[in-house]
Amino acid sequence: MNMKKATIVSAAGIAVTAFAAPSVVSANTVVVASGDTLWGIASKTGTTVDQLKQLNKLDSDRIVPGQKLTIKEVAAQKVEKSVSATWLNVRHAPDANEKILTSLKGRTVVKVESSEANGWNKISFDNGKTGYVNGKYLSDAKVAAPVVTKAVTHKAEAKVAATSTHAVKVDTNASTYKVKSGDTIWALSVKYGVPVQKLIEWNNLSSSSIYVGQTIAVKEAAAKAAPTTVKQAAPAKVAPKQEVKQTAPAKQEQAKPAAKETVKPAVSKPKAATPAPTAKPAVEQKASTPAVDTNAATYKVQNGDSLGKIASLFKVSVADLTNWNNLNATITIYAGQELSVKASAAKPKPAAPAKPAVSKPATSTPAKVTPTNTTNNSTPTTNVNNNTSQSSSASFSALYAEAKKHLGKPYTWGARGPSTFDCSGFTSYVFNQVGLSLSGNSATQYANSTKISESQAQPGDLVFFNYGSGIAHVGIYIGGGQMIDAQDNGVSIDNIHGNGWGQYLVGFGRV
């Protein structure tokens, strides 16, 4: 009988040993072994059954072999990650519909404070501010480097400090900022806490390109005033000077012979340069001419003008000017050229596309007619090539008008519209809205399009990009080296050769 009891006790001891020996994976987790119970694991690891159930979100005491259990809550550790997208919006809360605090450029290293259940990460800046970004656009940082925003901010502050201490005081409260060498639209976005898209909108920029000496509105209050200044300055400097050039030489040539021919040829040069005083009334005249400039339907190009300058002057986009004036992709303008600056004055499209209707009978006639109509046979060939695009010519106006409706809408991977888009979802939606068939992702759209060179590209064609693993982005070409597309910052207009796009450009496709 005693031997029987000893056997039972011995077996019980073995059972207890089995229950108390879960497989320890790390200091914070264990893997359940056969025969384990929550009570046994709690006793072994110095915790309680309730704590185990809470940490592992268990509704009952039931566990199964192979199940991994957390036995200790791990304190969140800050890790550094790198932005893998071209641009990444930082938002007020972990949701794509929340307010944008700023935007981070690709490869920026950020500190991740914590991760949310929906995949968003809370990040922090060196100034103590925090925000949220979509975790799928972050990758492990290979080198623990300081956050790029810090470097840019210090660089900007160092430059301002070197210029003057007064500039530093005005910096945070200023409503405008004068661009210095090394500045980028993104750096200004971080410095003033304004989204890149807002800076582009407030300053009537067609892309995120800026130049040294340019005055940028960094507060919404200055956005309305900035275009007015440009409007008044442009006519004053250019238009009156042309009139002076036409009339002043006549006066100078007549006055010189009458007074002193040989004695003061050298002095006459300063006199030729003295039209500066006559230009002063022109500066004062600025106040009397803005009404004509803003209401005019056409504008005569002056020396030093560019499409970007004219677009800012009349509050339109570069794409509008190219469309209204039937400009080529090269967008070359010249002094004296008259441009339509309002849709009501848009120049009619070339009548060439109507010729194919005549050419069809010519191509179907017997071979005998071909020799006699050599000119007619060559013309349709050119016209047919020009009409291979569904979206060319008359269709582009409708296509571009539809695309512009969605400017500023947020980007969501896989979204097909109309409230949010990814790149191929945007192109498909816009094309289909105007009756042009387009579907699939960016790679499919590339495969199904007719490949053309940049010199052949017309507004309405598609433009494609490859980040290294195949076609990964598509936009709608609008001419002048620009496209309208859905990217990380939402639907916007971008320069296909600037701001990091050029190195990934693959080519153009016609649908």
Curated annotation (Swiss-Prot):
GO terms for molecular function: cysteine-type peptidase activity. It comes from the Bacteria. Residues 229-291, 347-390 are annotated as: Disordered. Residues 78-142 form the SH3b domain. InterPro entries: LysM_dom, LysM_dom_sf, NLP_P60_dom, Papain-like_cys_pep_sf, Peptidase_C40, SH3-like_bac-type. This major extracellular protein may be involved in the invasion of non-professional phagocytic cells by Listeria. This is Probable endopeptidase p60. The lineage of its organism: Bacteria, Bacillati, Bacillota, Bacilli, Bacillales.
